[in-house]
Amino acid sequence: RIKGHGGADPLIPSIQVSSNCYFSYAYLAMLNKYPGNPSKGVDEWAKIMYSFGLGQFLNNDLAVGSKGLIPDGKFYEKKYGKNWKPLQAVFNGMGQGEILLTPIQIANFTAAIANRGWYYTPHIVKSIDGKPNPDKRFKVKNQTLVDPKHFEPVIRGMEAVVLRGTGRALKSNDFTQLAKTGTAQVPQGKDNSIYTMIAPADNPKIVVAAVMEHAGFGATWAGPACTVIAEKYLLGELKREHLYKRLTGASFMAEYNRQWVVHLKKIGRYEPPKPDSLAMKKIQDSLRLLNEKNKTIDNKNKQTQKTP
């Protein structure tokens, strides 16, 4: 048995417990499909990823965005040389390594899973002056390179995540969901919290994905954010008010600011903050008034004690 985050188990329970071992071995097997030529194996994988809209602009109506990164054979040949080894890319199997995805790409990828292999190009504009968006590209079904039958075990695994896996604390009594937790490790500081979900499980109406920087485990923060949004959309109200209050009362700015300071120091552009003179004056005035108030209270107490 291989120890560590779930072991090398079959697909469904590996999705359920987010097994790094299983997915690393699966990715390694793909790279080793062509002995001595891992570039060919990673190119086959990259081609499939591109068909989900990853590693490229989605051709949507957003003015800004990022292609992210799906590394191919040329990428690794440039980085490690033509004789690079599969183990140098194995971390891609667990979603780490050189893979870069945007939140909208994660949501779109999840929508393709819900549809068993196709997706509409995501867009913001639904209608103009009450008329449907005339852009035909948003009405075309984009087919992925994965046969619909291969999505069934993935969907069962995402169902198990919520029923008895890493996302079980987010299960709702009012709607079913399919989900995947994610914890993107950061070299320094807390990890990024990632979660993506489909609801309802048997008749999908909404996909929600969230990435919360330096927040920790996926099910701890990004998961509650996603499930609260889905709940409001599907039910028209919030049944789990405690999740909403916990989210709106939280702040990750301290860790985010710390990471920013680390970055500035790394590139030699950090300058210690200079105390604002007006702010310091206000603090000093407040302390003076507080001291005067305390002295007044002390004097009154002394007078009271002297009274026969």
Predicted regions and their residues:
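Extracytoplasmic/secreted cell-surface and envelope-processing proteins
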Residues: 23-25, 217-221, 239, 243
